[in-house]
């Protein structure tokens, strides 16, 4: 019998960024109570030796499962120390992997009532519409003109600590091009 392998997309992530994300998730689950219904599975509750933690986020009858890994093969850079994140959308027996942008967008659509395309219809029907969104990571594009006008009028309040973003968790902070000053004034160029 031949080996049967299953391939998963695992986003390389910084160890400290994973620790920060886990502590934000736990804070909002147990202290601020903004993450109701979420389930956190510790590494010792998993049978897989590489799983560091799992966070299950319910989305109606489906759920988003964010799994963090440790002890993976290191990447081509020195700082890729074998830490990673996989993001799955599960509904009954079906599961598929999603990217961090889509994961944040799904969380935003399910949990946060903010000013969006449907807000004008809600306002006409007499429902209360709030132009402030607590989870800005769920917006992956520039909003309509009405949204921009309302956000210019109302200053958003900062939430401390911020709600955990999946995109921020998987963001590669080392491979961003470094901005350096050019030799003429304050013009910036991409450094190497």
From Swiss-Prot:
Positions of region (Interaction with host APOBEC3F and APOBEC3G): 54-72
Tell me the segments the record calls region Interaction with host APOBEC3F: 14-17, 74-79
* Segments of this protein annotated with the region SOCS box-like: 151-180
Q: Site Cleavage in virion (by viral protease): which residues?
A: 150-151
What is the recorded post-translational modification? Answer: Processed in virion by the viral protease.
- Which residue stretches belong to region Multimerization? 151-164
* UniProt motif BC-box-like motif: location: 144-153
**Where's it found, cell-wise?**
Host cytoplasm; Host cell membrane; Virion
Q: Which residues carry this modification: Phosphothreonine?
A: 96, 155, 188
Cellular component (GO) terms are: host cell cytoplasm; host cell plasma membrane; membrane; virion component
- What's an example of a GO molecular-function annotation for this chain? RNA binding
Gene Ontology biological process terms in this record: viral life cycle
Recorded family membership: Belongs to the primate lentivirus group Vif protein family.
Q: What else is known?
A: Vif-defective viruses show catastrophic failure in reverse transcription due to APOBEC-induced mutations that initiate a DNA base repair pathway and compromise the structural integrity of the ssDNA. In the absence of Vif, the virion is morphologically abnormal.
What is the protein name given in its UniProt record?
Answer: Virion infectivity factor
């Amino acid at each position: 019998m031949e080996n049967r392998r299953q391939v998963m997309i695992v986003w390389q992530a910084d160890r400290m960024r994973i620790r920060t994300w886990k502590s934000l998730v736990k804070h909002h689950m147990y202290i601020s109570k903004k993450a109701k219904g979420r389930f956190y599975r510790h590494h010792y509750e998993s049978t897989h030796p590489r799983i560091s933690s799992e966070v299950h986020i319910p989305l109606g009858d489906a759920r988003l499962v964010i799994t963090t890994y440790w002890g993976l093969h290191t990447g081509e850079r020195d700082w890729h120390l074998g830490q990673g994140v996989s993001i799955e959308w599960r509904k009954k027996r079906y599961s598929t992997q999603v990217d961090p942008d889509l994961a944040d967008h799904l969380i935003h659509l399910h949990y946060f009532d903010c000013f969006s395309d449907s807000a004008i219809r809600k306002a006409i029907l007499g429902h209360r519409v709030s132009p402030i969104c607590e989870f800005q990571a769920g917006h992956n594009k520039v909003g309509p003109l009405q949204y921009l006008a309302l956000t210019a009028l109302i200053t958003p309040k900062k939430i401390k600590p911020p709600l955990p973003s999946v995109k921020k968790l998987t963001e590669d902070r080392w491979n961003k091009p470094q901005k350096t000053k050019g030799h003429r004034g304050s013009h910036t160029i991409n450094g190497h």
